[in-house]
């Protein structure tokens, strides 16, 4: 991910990257980055021929959340060339960057070989994303859900977790999620979080492809939780 707008612009220009806007078509038509091709998040799996596998690709959405879902999904399909711009359209426009309303058609690319089981799992995840984009809501909603019995997972690194975590949270570091499947509940709602929400958005597709469709993400994550003065625990 490239979170700084100037660094993002430099990276796109230097690499002649392909820009993918994964917002809904109506959002895209109201304004987008010049040259960005619109592939709404839920349709990514059906439009892989619009995404190159061998040149840099940057994905963005409105706030960064959908871009994380898209980046993680595409990487599971073998697109290691995909990065994201987490500030999204909000960050781009707040920085006073130019807005285009001219639709970009993009090119057609050869789709790489993907294991059929993985393609099916990822595409099933993408096409069934509900309204709300699998977000657990704001801090108030998350606190109420935890109070009501939702399980909590922390996808940050062990040192971050050791410095303090949301009460009852179990640490399942992002890069090691598949090794923790035995500790992920299947019979209750699960809310996962990180520090800022970015890693949480990357984690959602991983949990769901592993079969845990009861997992939602807390987009505000630990920063929003502590900013709200909510309690924390330490090991």
What are the language-model segments listed below?
Residues 61:
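Active-site neighborhood of phospho(di)ester-bond hydrolases with catalytic His/Asp-centered motifs
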């Amino acid at each position: 991910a490239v979170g700084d707008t100037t660094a993002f612009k430099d990276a796109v220009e230097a690499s002649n990257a392909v820009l993918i806007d994964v917002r809904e078509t109506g959002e895209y038509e109201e304004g987008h980055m010049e040259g960005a091709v619109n592939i709404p998040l839920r349709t990514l799996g059906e439009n892989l021929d619009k995404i190159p596998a061998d040149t840099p690709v940057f994905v963005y959405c409105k706030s960064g959340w959908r871009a994380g879902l898209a980046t993680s999904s595409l990487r599971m399909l073998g697109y290691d060339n995909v990065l994201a711009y987490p500030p999204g359209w909000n960050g781009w426009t707040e920085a006073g960057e130019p807005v285009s309303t001219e639709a970009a058609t993009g090119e057609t690319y050869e789709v790489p070989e993907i294991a059929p089981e993985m393609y099916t799992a990822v595409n099933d995840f993408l096409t069934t994303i509900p309204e709300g984009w699998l977000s657990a809501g704001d801090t108030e909603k998350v606190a109420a859900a935890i109070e009501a019995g939702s399980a909590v997972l922390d996808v940050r690194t062990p040192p971050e977790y050791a410095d303090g975590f949301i009460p009852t949270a179990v640490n399942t570091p992002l890069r090691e999620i598949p090794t923790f499947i035995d500790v992920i509940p299947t019979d209750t709602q699960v809310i996962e979080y990180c520090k800022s929400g970015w890693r949480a958005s990357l984690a959602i597709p991983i949990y769901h492809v592993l079969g845990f469709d009861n997992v939602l993400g807390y987009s505000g994550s630990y920063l929003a939780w502590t900013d709200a003065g909510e309690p924390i625990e330490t090991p």
